Amino acid sequence: MSILSTRWFSEQEIEENSIIQQFHMNSIVGEVQEAQYIFPHSFTTNNDPSYDDLIEMKPPKILETTYISPSSHLPPNSKPHHIHRHSSSRILSFEDYGSNDMEHEYSPTYLNSIFSPKLEAQVQPHQKSDEFNRKGTKRAQPFSRNQSNAQDHIIAERKRREKLTQRFVALSALVPGLKKMDKASVLGDALKHIKYLQERVGELEEQKKERRLESMVLVKKSKLILDDNNQSFSSSCEDGFSDLDLPEIEVRFSDEDVLIKILCEKQKGHLAKIMAEIEKLHILITNSSVLNFGPTLDITIIAKKESDFDMTLMDVVKSLRSALSNFI
C-alpha cells in the first residue's frame, strides 16, 4: 500500500511540474503574440533570429498519463517500475525561476530591446520630419527679422522723400521768376540765382573799396536865404579846413519848429554831446534819428523853440560849429 501511494505522489508531482511549465510557456507565448500584434512589422521569421530561438524554446506537448492499478495489471510477485520520460522532456525542462526573473526576461522592455533595430528604422523618419519642422521654425525667425527691417527701411524712405519735397517747395518760394515747379527746373533756377547773387556781391565789394566821401552840400561861402517865414542856412568849411575835418551843419526854422541836420565823423560819444549842445541853445528836442553813412553819422533832429529862445539861424549854426569843433 505504501509503495502505491509513493508512486502515485511521484506521478502527481511530475504532472504538476509539467502543468506549471506549460503555464509559464503559454504566458510567454501570449506576451510574444501581443507584442507581435503591437509591432506587426517588426516580427518576421526571416530577418530576426531571436524569433526562432523563442520558437525552439517552446516545450513539446506533454502526454497525459493515466493511473493503472497495480493489482490489476502487475503480476503478484513483480515489482513496480518507474516510468521514464523521453530524454527530450528532460532537455526542455525548466528550472524553478523566480517570478521577478521571468518578468524581467520577457517583459515588454526586453522585447523592445530585441526588436529595437526595426523600431528605430520606423521611428527615424518621424524624428527627421520633426527635426526638419523645428529647423524650419528656426529658419523662419531670420525671415521675419528681414521682413521687419524691410518695413523700417520703407518707412524711413517715405519720411526722407517727404522732407525732400518740403525743402523743394521752400526753395521754389525763394527763387524769383520761377516758371516751372518740377524739381529739375527749381534746382536749375536756384543755381542761376545763386550765381547772380555772387556776382552782385563782388561788384558791391569793388564799389566799396573805390568809394570816396563826397559831401552833397558844400558851400564855399555863407549865404542867407529868406523865403517868407521859412528861413534856411547852410554852413561849410570856409577857413581852410578840409571837408572831412569839420562837420556839415544845416538849420531850418518854420515858425516854432526847428530842423537840424548834422553830418560828422563817426566817433564814440558824439551823439550825446551834440544833443547836450542843442539843449543849451534853449531848443527842445522832440524827435531824432541817426544813420550810418560809411565812416560818418547822419544826424537829423526835429525840435521846438522854447519861450526864452532868442537867436538867429546864423547864431545857431555858429554856436553848434564852435561846440562841435572842440570835441571832434
From Swiss-Prot:
InterPro entries per the UniProt record, alphabetical:
bHLH_dom (IPR011598), bHLH_transcription_regulator (IPR052610), HLH_DNA-bd_sf (IPR036638)
Gene3D superfamilies in alphabetical order: Helix-loop-helix DNA-binding domain
Q: State the protein's name.
A: Transcription factor bHLH25
Residues spanning the signal sequence:
none
PROSITE patterns xrefs: BHLH
* Induction line: By ethylene (ACC) and jasmonic acid (JA) treatments.
Q: Which domain of life is it from?
A: Eukaryota
Give the lineage. Answer: Eukaryota, Viridiplantae, Streptophyta, Embryophyta, Tracheophyta
Example GO molecular function: protein dimerization activity
